[in-house]
Structures are given as C-alpha cells and as structure tokens.
Amino acid sequence: IHKMLNPRSIAVVGASPKGGYGGRLLNALLRSKDRVNIYPVNPNYDEISGLKAYKSISDLPEAPDLMGVVVPYDKVLGVLKEGHAKGAGSAVIISAGFAERGTDSGLDLQRQVGAFARESGLRVAGPNCLGLANVRDDIWPTASSRTLGGLTGHIALVCQSGATAFGPFLLRAVDAGIGLSHIISTGNETDLDFSDFARYLIDDPGTRVVAGFVEGFKDVQKFIAMAKLAAERGKPIVLIKIGRSESGARAARSHTAALTGADSLYDAMFKQYGVIRVSDYDELLEVAQLFAYSRKPRKPGIAVVSHSDGINAILKNFGWAANPADVTGFARGQHFPTIMRHMIDEPTVGTLVVASAGGADQVPQVIAMRDNTEKNVAYFWTASRADKDTLTTLKKSHIPIFYTPQKLAQGLKSLLRYHAWQDDCVADGAAQVPKATEEQMSALTAFQNAGRSALSERESKEVITAWGVPAAREVRASSAGGAVEAAQKLGYPVALKVDSADILHKTEAGVVRLGLRTADEVRQAYDEITASAKRYAPDAVTAGVSVQEMVTGGVEVIIGIQYDAQLGPMLLFGSGGVMVEVFNDVALRHCPITPAEARRMIEEVKGAKLLRGFRGKPAADIDALAATLVRVSQMAVNLEGRIAELDINPLMVLPVGQGVKAVDALVVLKTLEV
C-alpha cells in the first residue's frame, strides 16, 4: 500500500492519446512528472503526451511502484502477471467488466485477479475503480477528470465508489476549503478493501481522520480490528454507510430478529467501536474537519457567542448551548475579544462557538482567540457563502465551519461522544471468549443431528443453562395427572405451557397458563392447552406440557442473539415480556462484549429505571444481569454457524443478590431455511 500511495514510478498500462480512461489517467499524472517517472504502456504508440511509450511492461527501464491498469477486462490478469514478473510494487485496476456485470464469468475473473494478488504479493486496488490521489504530494493516479492542487489537509477519504470520491466529495471539499491528505476509491475490492487502506492511514502521520463512504464490508472482523486500533491511536473514523433500507429482510422467527433490522445492527456496531456515522456528503466533511482541527474537549460545556438573539434561540433548541450570549453592537468592536475570552474561560466550557456573519474585523479576532487557547473554537456561518473574502480567511485558518445548526449540533455531539467513548474503550480492555466445552456443544449436537429447525422451550433452556444462564425449574408431563404430580413436586403456584418446537410463540397460540394454585386448576389448564395447541397447529408435534415454577418479584427483560451475514453474532438486550415488539426498547452490540459494555447496554434501555428500583419496588440484581449478557455474548461466538437466532424472553431479573432466571427461551437452528 505504501508504494501505491507514495509511488515514485508509475506505468500507465493502456495509456492513450485519444481520451477515455487511459487518456485521463495519463493526463492526471502529467502534473507530477517532475517528481514521478511516468511510463505510458501501449504497443500502438511510440510517444503519448510527450512521453516515450513502451510496448510492454517488460520493456520498462525499471520496475514501477504502481501500475495503472486500463485494458479490456480479459487482459487484466495477464497484465498483473507480467507486472509481477517485472517486479512491480502494486496496481490500480481502472478496468471494469468484473463482478459488477452480474455474470458468473465476471465474478470468476475477479476472483482469479484477487487470488493472484494475494498469492503473488502484488497488491491491487479495484477493479472497477477510478484510482486514487496522494493529495499531499500532488500525485493523482486517477481516471477522474477532476484533479485539483492546493487542497492539502489532514483528512483521508476512502470510498468504495470512485464517482462519489472524485465527484461530490471532492467538489464539496474544494467549496468548503477542507483539505485532504488522500483520496482512494476501492471499487470492487477483490484484494485491498476499505479496512486495509484505513489501517494504513492510521499509521500515516499526516492523516488525522479517515472519512469513508461504504456500502458494506468484505471482512467485518478486519474492520473491527482496524476500528479498535484507530481508537487506541486517537484517529477517528467518520463514515457514510449507505443502504439503510430494510427491504429484502428475511422473515423473523424470534422476537430478536423482529426487533433488529440490518441497518440497526450496523448502527450498533459503529457505536460500539467508536465509528462516527453521518448521513450525507456535507456532514461527513464538516464532522471530519471538526475532528481534524479540534482537541479532546477538556469539558463538555459549549459556549455560543452571536450577534443575534434569534440565532441563539435557534441554537438553544438543539439542547447543548446552555449559555448563549447575544453581543449585538459588540460583534465587530474592540470588546468582542474580551467577550469571547470571558465565555471560553468559563470552567465548565470546553468549546466556543461563534455564530455570526463574519465581519472583516471579527474573523481575525476569532482566529487569534483560537490560536491563544487550548480549548476548541468552531464557527457557525450565518451569512451568504458569496461573501468570499472573510469566509476564505476562515477556511484557510482551519477553524471548523458549519452552515446549519443541525450539522453544528451533530458535529459537536459526535466530538463529545467519541472522546467519552474512547476513554471507556481504553479502560475496558478486550472482550474474552472462553473455548466452549464438550458438554456445552453436546447440548446442541443431538438436536442438529435430528434435522430440527427449532428447539422447544425446554430444549432451548438445556442449551442456555449449559452456558451458565439459570432457568426456572420445570417438569415435563404427558397427562393431566402427571401435570398435577409435577405441580405438587415443584410447589404451587405453577405455570403450564405446551412442550413443542413447532409452536414458537406460545402466548399467541393460547397455550400458556400462569399462576395455577390448585390441582383442579392444573387439570383444567392441561385440557385447555392441549386443545388450543391442536386448533392452532394441527400438525404440530407436541410432547405434552411443561410444568414450571412461577418466578415472581423480578423485572422482565429480553436477551437475544441474531447472526448477520456480514456482521456475524449480534447481541440484543431490552425490556421483555409479551409486549416486547410493541415497545421496541432495545440495545444492540456486536459479540463478544466486556462487562463494562454489558452495563452500558443496560443503561441504554428505558426500562433500566425498573431495574434500579421504581415506586417502592426493590432494586434488581444488575450485576447478575450484566454477567448473563457477557455469557450469552460468548455463547453467540461459540455457536456461530450452528444456530440462527436465540430468544430468552422473559429473563427475570430478581432482587439484588438473587440472580436471574430464564422463564422462556427459543433457539432457532442454522439448518432452518429462511
């Protein structure tokens, strides 16, 4: 990657004097020909754009650090092999015609290119990309028609879409005066992907922020490892993740699946690993700029100085400007620096926001304040962007500029949350996953071997108890008399439920009876449940009923597992019970989690108030709940590839010191066609 981003010799394979991608790539590189050896390669020409053209890569006078490949797709693999034989350092494949065609042949060819890149060590960006740019050194190996100098800064832009990277992002960065260190389009990512480039940029001293535009990740574990390292190094990752639509989601068998959409899983993962997600091009650049040119806030307080009380009123609506000052009449006077100093020196203030139209005398005063304080300064521009002189001065000063109160508020919130998260992340350490024991795995193996799609409640509890999750005591009964005997053994009151893997949501089927206190009630409940089961699912296989102890005096919560095709195991926690999908009060995390992360999950849920004791109720055993969340997250990793979903709903969190008990559980096996 270093040679790719810092080349001193570049071969343009497929260079052309006729325009097109080959012509644009060569023309973009001509600006750096005084610093980089540029070699056009095309057997049909002796000279292109004033440079000697070569018949083949083998004819080059040196092994190029980078090959820009612009040849028909069926010639690309041959070019890579020839380049490898020459000793080329890397390649950017502009050529299209691979997996994006949607054909088996295109996908197969792309796989061959990727396999060769990994086996040979000739690392590849693309195919189907627009190239890249080392903006800092003004080297632009890109087939984009847009190349601009003088835009140097500390933000690296990595996009899976080349048209987006060199189109709206580049144009907006120029318009906003936001400098970049690199622009990288990754295309189809047959070899190097977003995470690889971001990992390299974490080590780049000239890059302070990695900004990205992605649709998905080839290797989520690699992305997570990169994000963790970025947090340790203090380099924020700011992303637009497209594809928020939930269309095409599979039918949900468990409550957990119904409560989690694909996009909510990404949101949870980003939050867990400190990735700042934004919504649009402007927000990405403005937030990245704020991080690139701001320190860690010493205090969370934000002071706002404005020439308009109306602007202050607008900013107050966003909930973070507690002390706005209307300085009408002083905004352009000699007293303005004193006012700013008074505001920024407040002990609770970590950031000063100046909201103004940017007068010619005021802007230098704001810049001077930024240069003479260790606190952060940002600017909310309230005038027309056509007022170029003072706005240009602000841009050149690298004071973060925002143009809407919404994006200003979002940016400042992101800054505060990121640094708070970073402190927590460093303190947490790594999540642990003990290797599953033979006894734990055998709890599931028998059911899988039987070709089952889901487990009954009783069977599901056998699985979770193997991972240390306590469950309510129960006895299976196949007759009304047997149910009475079981109830007497457990002690009244009891609950009766049908024992069947074919009836997953028992409340809906009418096959649950609670709080039974006498033998007569148990007999009646048995008859009603068996009749209801036959009406609800005539073909269901049942094994009688499960007679369970009634667990009372606790708070109902749900813990669940879902496996995403890209993200892997995800853990859900929320307020539980039969209304769980109505309230949708949940927190999500990627598995495994640390004990501290478990407690943060608990605090995210509105129902956490009930756990702390509410209206005279005793406080619940939050320590036991947090430990259970950790164990279930470890279980999720251990059972990846073997189960599809897990619900523990409800899990009763009993008063402090009494632990937790699973009252109901559902395991959906991986073999289920969904």
Question: What residues fall within each predicted segment?
Answer:
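General beta-strand structural signal in soluble alpha/beta enzymes
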Residues: 39-41, 91-93, 117-118, 123-128, ...
